[in-house]
Regions:
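A structural signal for short, hydrophobic/glycine-enriched beta-strand patches
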Residues: 112, 118-268
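Extended hydrophobic blocks
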Residues: 1-123, 222-285
Length: 285
């Protein structure tokens, strides 16, 4: 309705250029949405080729197919409109359109706020820097993705104005891993950086992002009263992580490290889906 109201407002003006601009926008928006669907499918195949098959890596092509199916549905619906057209068919169609619009606008808002959050200024004084774990290479070594997180955390460690700051390596041991993710992070720090061993704490119980934060918070509170945290993860993951941090009353900020460009679309979709599941009551309401 907002979209139609804006269109009506523009066409109420007597300026021909404004009319032409609105026509261009009306045509451009569906074209861009259609192209985004094609892009996500292509990106999905690139991701599957580089990262291998997994349920998470299927999100990008699935989202692309869903977008294209919307246009197919609208085309089929247009073909059914005749003189004896049953208008009750509009009810499920309008429901589907409404669902697409709600989730579409929410996804755009999610992405915009995620990027804004990354650019927000960070305070320099923290008591702990949390390195969020990730899957391990051959079950015992850090992956390039996890290495970028660690390097970003080390950079923040040396830039900190707190002489007593500590790193928390956070991550439990998966069923296919030989050691915990926290231990792998610790090994990398000891072997490849100058961070003192006594400045590294291990949190080896967590299996999810939420637990990473919760258990790290509990660990930090054993050493400092009302500690401030800087949690380091990938840029696409910062917004959801900061949402969980607020839920558990953690004081601190998120810091994102770079991500391979081909991985970003699928990663943001995955983060969005995870956030929707966590906040499903908001969408249902």
């Amino acid at each position: 309705f907002l979209y139609l109201s804006i269109v009506n407002l523009v066409f109420s003006f007597e300026y021909e250029n404004a009319h032409l601009l609105m026509v261009a926008v009306i045509l451009l928006i569906p074209i861009l949405i259609l192209l985004s669907g094609v892009f996500l499918i292509i990106n999905g195949f690139i991701l599957l080729k580089k990262e291998g098959f997994s349920k998470a890596n299927l999100l990008s092509p699935i989202m692309g197919i869903v977008i294209l199916l919307f246009f197919v549905m609208m085309w089929i619906r247009a073909g059914f409109i005749t003189t004896d057209y049953n208008h009750w068919i509009n009810i499920p169609v309008l429901f589907i359109i409404y669902t697409y619009i709600i989730f579409g606008f929410a996804f755009v808002g999610f992405m915009m706020y995620s990027f804004v959050y990354l650019w927000l200024p960070k305070k320099q004084h923290y008591d702990f820097i949390i390195v969020h774990g990730a899957g391990l290479l051959n079950g015992e070594r850090v992956t390039p993705l996890l290495k970028r997180r660690i390097d970003k955390a080390v950079q923040a460690f040396y830039q900190s104005k707190n002489p007593h700051i500590r790193l928390i390596a956070s991550g439990g041991q998966g069923s296919d891993e030989k050691i915990s993710e926290a231990q792998a992070i610790y090994n990398y720090l000891v072997e490849n950086t100058d961070v003192p061993k006594e400045a590294i704490l291990l949190e080896e119980k967590s299996t999810t992002t939420y637990e990473n934060l919760l258990f790290s918070k509990e660990l930090g509170e054993q050493f400092v009263e009302n500690p401030r945290f800087l949690f380091v993860t990938n840029d696409y993951h910062v917004f959801r992580t900061s949402t969980y941090a607020r839920q558990i009353g953690m004081q601190g900020d998120g810091l994102g490290c770079s991500t391979a460009s081909y991985y970003i679309p699928s990663a943001f979709i995955r983060e969005y889906v995870a956030l929707c599941v966590k906040m499903k009551k908001l969408f249902i309401g």
